Amino acid sequence: MEWVRDETPENAVFSHWWDYGYWVQSIGNRATVLDGGNAIAYWNYLMGRLVLTGDNQADALEFLYNHDATHLLIDSSDIGKYTAFSSIGSDKDFDRYSWMSPFVMDDKQTQETNNETLFFYPGGLTLDEDLVIEDSGREVLLPKGGAGIGAVVVSANTQTNQYQQPYVIAVYQGKQYRVKLRYLNIEGRFIDFGSGIEATAYIFPRLDNNQGRIAVNGIGTALYISPRLMRGMLAQIYILEDPLNNFPNFKIAHTQSSLIVEDLRNQGLDLPEFVFYQGIQGPIKIWDVEYTGNEEIKQEYLDKDPTKYLDWKL
């Protein structure tokens, strides 16, 4: 919070998930859109729906404009909280509800052939929405809540030193399906393969403590960023750094690495912002919010009574 307190104007207004309110107000000494006491549930809904899981920049900017927000803050604990704010930000059919969980490489299952190395990341994740795939020339429905992801698989061509299109192993009713993903983010590169489901395999380092010595596997952990997550703002700008340029008016202003990553860097390790060590370690990121000039005041975003706009109870 030192940067917030010392490097932003005194009249700055910070937007973030509600439970950071007291933190920013008391330590950063800045105003916030959402209150740390969870006082206005409807605004939490709007923040969850239009910003954190929002699928377009215009809605996010208009909500923030109505609350005079100058900055957006996201912390790595929001990855674990995604289930909470995506549920709160959903409609009555839970259209934004989703979750993230790491898939950790099983070194013993790494397979090498003459020209390919196959990296296997086992795990378990239920589908957050229906997925229709093609299998042996026919369409197959993998239903949300019933089907799941059992592993993420990434391969590299050892002759060209190029990564190949990743896929996940989906499981439904005892049968496994290989489902190709369109995107791969690995070693600082975002690769678009042009086909596959609109999902990303996000690969980042795993750190192992072996008798007091830290060993780094630079591609040791995977996140499966589902199509639903990929439509959301948090995954696009916080994890992937807006590779599709869908949120250009959010300009990164400050990145504060996690204390664990900072400490390990001070010990000589060259680490990116995200690592897997005693859980996912990631930075605090803060963006300047630059408005387009097309935003308008909407009473719907200022009201505190959701019953005027929603036909279900938050």
Task: Please place each PLM-identified region on the residue numbering.
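Extracytoplasmic
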Residues: 1-314
